[in-house]
Each structure stands twice: as structure tokens, then as C-alpha cells.
């Protein structure tokens, strides 16, 4: 079986090898973090391409996890998976309520503000988790009012007025001078 790259969603990253028996250190992007191990199979994006792997054992280790990839039984084999993104097929992710979005759905959307008349601020390049609320990182581009990077709190109803995935836009109430 193969998965199209467009159907894959990054859910974590293999950061390093762990020990000599083929274990790897894993950083999870899921919330809660151990949800990462509920998804099967993993598609690992290495410098050699995308490969399907199965995890046969995993456990917490510090602020991350360590995992064993089935069939990878020594440190040298595990080394080939370091610095690799972990992805799963999009349809494995739980359905969200109306008005809720996965971060990867928001990345790449154009952001417009209604402050002082509709103006393009740029494109969402990533999101940050701050504890209080998530933050959109919006980078200005050739079509926006300037090239600045802006950090806009993702607070629906207050700063984020609407998200339209079909038209690939987010409408915000945000002063462009901030």
C-alpha cells in the first residue's frame, strides 16, 4: 500500500537514536502527546523517500517518547530514520466539531484583516502553542501590504472572524501596525 503525500499529515518527528537495539526518540505533535501511538501505520518521510513503518513498542522518556520500529534492531538501521517526519493518513484523524481545525489545515491560508478596510497581511506559515491560546504566524508576501511577520492570537470571535478552507482565507480583526 502507498499513500499519496497530499493525504498525509505530520504528527511527529523522529529526533535521534536511543540505545543500541534500534530504538528512536520521538517528538509528538499530537494532543495529548501519546495519541501519536494510536495511529497505524506511520509513514516516515526520510531523505530517501516515504516509507511505511509499524511501531511494536513505545514508552515515555523525559518530555518525549522512545519507540521501536518493527524490524529495526540495531543503532545503525535506526540512524536512517533520524530527522524524519512522522505522518499518518488524514482519514485516521478524528472528525472535529464545526469551527475547529487541525493546524495543518490553517497553514498556507491567506490572512486578511478588516481593520481599516480589507487588507492582505500574508500567509500562515505555522502556528505556535503558547498555553493561553494558539498563535498564527503570518508572513507577509508579494501580495500583502508589507513583508512583515505578524503573530496573531487564534481567538475565534475576537481576533479570528472566519476561516474559509474552500477559498483558503482567514479573516481577522487585527491592526496591521501590530
Curated annotation (Swiss-Prot):
Q: Where in the cell is it found?
A: Cytoplasm
Q: Which Gene3D superfamilies has this protein been placed in?
A: PRC-barrel domain, RimM
Decide whether keyword Chloroplast is in the record.
no
GO terms in the biological process aspect are: ribosomal small subunit biogenesis; rRNA processing
One Gene Ontology cellular component term attached to this UniProt record is: cytoplasm
**Keywords for this entry?**
Chaperone, Cytoplasm, Ribosome biogenesis, rRNA processing
A single GO molecular-function term is:
ribosome binding
Residues forming the PRC barrel domain are 98-178
The UniProt similarity line reads:
Belongs to the RimM family.
What does the annotation say about its assembly with partners? Binds ribosomal protein uS19.
Name the HAMAP family on file: Ribosome_mat_RimM
What does this protein do, in the record's words?
Answer: An accessory protein needed during the final step in the assembly of 30S ribosomal subunit, possibly for assembly of the head region. Essential for efficient processing of 16S rRNA. May be needed both before and after RbfA during the maturation of 16S rRNA. It has affinity for free ribosomal 30S subunits but not for 70S ribosomes.
**Note on domains (UniProt):** The PRC barrel domain binds ribosomal protein uS19.
Know the name of this protein? Ribosome maturation factor RimM
